Amino acid sequence: GAFLIPFLPKIGRQVYMIFLVILSAFSLFNGFGTHLTINVLDYNFIINYSDNLSLPFAIVVHIAAFITIIYGAHKDDWKENVAVISYAGAAIAALHAGDLFTLFFWWEATAFTSVFLILGGNTTRAYRAAFRYIVIQVGSGMFLLAGAVLFLYSNGNALLGQMSIDDTSGLLIFLAFGIKAAFPFLNGWLQDTYPEASEVGTVALSSFTTKLAIYALARSFAGTDILIYIGALMTFFPIFFAVIENDLRRVLAYSLNNQLGFMVVAVGIGTELAINGAVAHAFAHIIYKGLLFMSMGAVLYRVGTCKASELGGLFKYMPITAVCSIIGAISISAFPLFSGFVAKSLIMSSLGYEGLSFIYFMLLFASAGVLHHSGIKIPFFAFFAHKSGHKPKEAPLNMIIAMVIGSVLCILIGIFPSVFYQILPYSVEYQPYDFSHVLSQLQLLTFAAFAFICLW
């Protein structure tokens, strides 16, 4: 469907893209099971497979695609339109892949479609970052392909399911997923590229690539113990870089890496509660991190910079953008009554039930860091702090609509967690709003806020 976009006028493109997302969303009602296979040379490619794990990821990717299209509606750029819809389509198709070779095809498709969003930054830095990005992403695909071939040779099939890193094939596939999930020492591409993309491109990038990797890890490596320690390290080390970073979009990129760590820990635990936590956190994260990137993208669009040292005092001129940014910041910080709280609580509780006290306290420290660098630093330096002298207009109406949709979702998920929990892979009887959970989280947030005040 994306091939028609260049031939349509601006308004027609936006309407057509939304139509494609809605049309794709009908697939969510197909039910669980295998819906489409293609036989080539006696090999069955499972093109469309759905179950209780893929469904919540597919739902939120459709939501993110819809919001991203609205967010970018002010731009008359058919190349970016094609990239956004193709990228979203590739991610959705990858979520429904039932075998490793089908996954490989769409895995690489997400790489080649998303690179154009980085090129859309239209700077020398963006062009160089895009080259590095595609090399890394194609490398991930090559590991996946090599692992798939070995897996087929060893097992007689290439079904996408539970694997072990004790096998060479499993280890190669694990490495492929780890690159896309931005594991420690494999994560440089994320902070290198996301801040260089266009304001629309960064929103799309934050939603699809890394969450596809989390889905793949949950599909194939749930309960792999080493993921607990990899994830804990991911939550920990980006905090220090985010605290000292001046570019607020790069701060959010470090923060994204930190949040992925929570999901990876949950996948490593592998219990039903933990997998629910990983999926819930990925779902909520796509929305609130997209909201934060949208708010900073609006600032970049109106002011021309996202450097903290050059911003401040914008609340007076961009109040709606500021409020939406604050809602995103509150959500990522896991304040009660917002989406981050009801998602992250599942992960923290699963750690407690498994007796992983050291990892639990590492994630508590990481949670305090999230409040510092994303919950406070982002809205404070952009919209408050010192007066920068900038007097921009409020964001365009389409940007505001997209940010308001994201804000409303952050609030609704936080207020109605039982409804949210119904789409998770496993049935769950969990109450996030018991007294101990709320009190401990408020204490953590209070002390983290106090630390920010002291350091500032």
Where are these regions (language model features)?
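Alpha-helical transmembrane segments
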Residues: 1, 16-27, 62-65, 85-89, ...
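Transmembrane helix-loop-helix hairpins at membrane boundaries of multipass inner-membrane proteins
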Residues: 1-82, 157, 161-162, 188
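Hydrophobic alpha-helical membrane-insertion segments
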Residues: 18-29, 140-146, 328-332, 402-418
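Membrane-helix interface motif
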Residues: 29-38, 150-157, 332-347, 412-431
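Short aromatic-rich membrane-water interface segments that cap or initiate transmembrane helices
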Residues: 41-57, 163-170, 350-361, 433-439
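Hydrophobic alpha-helical transmembrane segments
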Residues: 50-61, 176-177, 360-368, 435-454
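Hydrophobic transmembrane alpha-helices and their helix-loop junctions in integral membrane proteins
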Residues: 67-78, 82, 86-103, 113-398
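Cytoplasmic/organellar membrane-interface segments at the starts of transmembrane helices
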Residues: 316-320, 377-456
